[in-house]
């Protein structure tokens, strides 16, 4: 009949709260244990993936000279060249010649030799280079500098054979400016490089005149004009020869007059000559 409403049994009224409790329990479990799916973070508007950017190196970060593990042995020779601005290094590899003028630190491995080219402005800066040794200057006697690599024994030599390293200063004597070692702060000390490496640093100056000479010449005094004494003044006007002198002035030479040229008349040959020499 219309308007009839079925009464709920006590069993149904007990089942409904139980279902509600199960729904709340499943929702709490879902919040505590989210599904193991890779969720991609999306932006609020574009929906693009948000990249993870690692910290970029600072401009003043140290540049280390750490070598690979297979090269860190006692037989490895390390050759360091310090370049000034505007200079270059020519490396001869048999039939190939490389011209190197880097703006930053450049490291080359040639057989058992490690060639490190360091610009001077990088080495002079406080945060430019890490090195466990003190660098000494070697000033070449020529402006251009060339190296030759021998593929047989793996050695690098100077092609001109004119660059000799300066000996360190003796105790009690101050070394000249160009012989003093380039001190590197202790903060730049880096572990991991064996001190047994043979480090031969070279400095190639662009203008050798900027470095002081080994034996400086004494300064040349500038000439200063001195006044002439009054008794030393003389004049050449009015000087005459003495009468007792054996020298006499020569008479003045006569002025050359006009030259007279006489006219020569040519007469015909005589008849007798014609008769004697007949054809």
UniProtKB/Swiss-Prot annotation:
InterPro entries recorded: PRR23
Pfam family, one: DUF2476
Protein name: Proline-rich protein 23D1
Polar residues bias: start-end ranges: 15-33
Region (Disordered): 1-60, 247-270
Family, per entry: Belongs to the PRR23 family.
Encoding gene (name): PRR23D1
